[in-house]
């Protein structure tokens, strides 16, 4: 999983297609309808959570979904999207001879048309216009479309699209060009952060700002409509609240779609790749749109934000020494935890038993809100979120217990040892001084021979 999931909301696990329900009392669930696309993914953008995936890492042909990257490189390398560009038909005319001409889409852009980069982005993102994508690639790269493709691949590596490789800016069929549902979702999430991208992709109909009146005398009739039928209110595939981002069709790659839907404050991104273009009876079908709609319906019907841990929940207690009164303190979560949750799974099945205390015992005083430890919420053995545990209330210290504790502890303290050593040294010094004083006193008491005494007379010699 990507590093983002080690972040604030570890709610990726509640995406229950990845959870083994055999260890719980839950009945499990499946999508109510079959997903026809070979690869699919549904992400809640609000918490960056994958809530459904099918073959999300299988390599598929992107088709004109490539235009998402074309738009990214254009937006990031064009200082002013209002800059005008004169269209040169020779930049894309060679595509007329491609083997898979039916895969290509055109927007009635002609040679010498003068359009802003903004216009070209609208034409490309709404209709998959190869005139627009080739013109963007040619001009942004300074006249070398292959250089632009290299810029696309460099950006893919920077974003972390590890299973994606681009060979052209149009999405034209090329077996060497591939991607995955996971990479397309990651690319789209990146693109949505860029200026103008969301606005462009969310537009259903657009008219160029600076038409060449010679090529387009009826300016009002020159309009580009988004190819995503989910945005067409008159279509049977209309889906309220959808933002159409991009569709793609390839004869050899099937139908692809990336769509964004918003409802009741929830935002979902759906990706469907390699959907059949025809039914078993040979009828034209739009299973990619049906798959996106089904994924959105499933999410809106069965997922909602639920409080899985209240900040008032008591999750254990710790013993408190020297307490005045209760000799324990209760622990509660520091904050409330709300996660996007599947409504058929009871939140009571979430385990709260994985608690790590900072200390096994506390000493008073303890203040309300003081950090005591952490609890990790788990479902089916997988972590959902980690929350700090704090003290519910104050625990005051008993003066009597504290004084007795200090008195008992003092003989074992380093202060006591230091005091004992210092006292011993001082006593030793005192004894030495006392001995010295006694010796000196005795010396002072011993009689001394007078310096000028009269010599004793020897009477015998005198005679």
Language model: regions and residue ranges:
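Hydrophobic core
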Residues: 10, 14-18
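Domain-terminus/edge residues, biased toward the C-terminal soluble/receptor-binding domains
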Residues: 161-162, 175-178, 182-183, 188-424, ...
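Bacterial N-terminal signal peptides that target proteins for export
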Residues: 1-9
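Alpha-helical transmembrane segments forming the membrane-embedded cores
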Residues: 457-463
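Active-site-adjacent loops and short helices of periplasmic peptidoglycan-processing enzymes
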Residues: 20-182, 186-195
